[in-house]
Every structure is written in C-alpha cells, then in structure tokens.
C-alpha cells in the first residue's frame, strides 16, 4: 500500500490494526499477515516524519487491537503512556487481546521490541 501523507498513514494504521485484531480472533492468517505488513508500513511513514504523537489518541481507542498497535508503535517514544495502555488491556481483557498486550510488554522488557 502506497502512503502519500501522514493522514493516509494514520488511516492505514487504524484500519489495518482493526483488521489485524479481527484476523487474530478468527484465525485468518493470510489477511492478518497482510494487515501486519500495512501497519508496519504506516509506522515507518509516521516515523520518517517524526510524528509519532499522532498515534497517542489511539491509545484510548475503543478497539483493543488499535490500542495495542498504537502502544507498540509508541513504546520507545512515549514509554510511560504505551506501557500504561498495555497494562490496562491486560487487566481488563482475559482473551486474546489481553494476551497480546501481555506478550508485547514481555517482549519489550526483554529488549526484543
């Protein structure tokens, strides 16, 4: 997916984070992998412009997958906010999204993210 500007990057990020969450829950690996690629591409575009702050409002999005991906993208930029968002998801979701948030925190602590 070709991204032309920050607005498109943010839209791409959010849309694909939602898709990725759906695919995580329903097991659609092919579509999930494509959405993952698009999310990473959007993050790279946002990073190139040094505009990570446009992701901060997504830490409070209604969609847990959007919140997890926003936190992932912000872990090295705004660590306290990102970690707080992930910990809240771990506390409030006992399903796959809570597990994903917990694994993201664990991998960050290990230095793998």
Predicted regions and their residues:
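Short, intrinsically disordered/low-complexity patches at protein termini
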Residues: 89-93, 106-108
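Charged low-complexity stretches with an acidic bias
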Residues: 64-88
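Structural detector for internal amphipathic alpha-helices that build alpha-solenoid repeat scaffolds
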Residues: 2-4, 11-15, 26-47, 68-77, ...
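Amphipathic alpha-helical scaffolding segments comprising HEAT/armadillo-like alpha-solenoid repeats
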Residues: 3-11, 23, 46-58, 79-91, ...
């Amino acid at each position: 997916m070709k991204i032309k500007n920050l607005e498109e990057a943010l839209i791409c990020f959010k849309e694909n984070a939602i898709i990725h969450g759906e695919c995580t829950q329903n097991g659609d690996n092919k579509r999930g992998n494509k959405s993952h690629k698009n999310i990473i591409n959007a993050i790279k575009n946002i990073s190139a412009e040094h505009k990570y702050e446009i992701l901060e409002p997504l830490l409070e999005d209604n969609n847990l997958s959007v919140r997890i991906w926003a936190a992932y993208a912000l872990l090295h930029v705004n660590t306290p906010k990102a970690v707080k968002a992930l910990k809240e998801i771990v506390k409030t979701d006992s399903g796959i999204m809570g597990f994903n948030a917990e694994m993201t925190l664990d991998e960050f602590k290990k230095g793998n993210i």
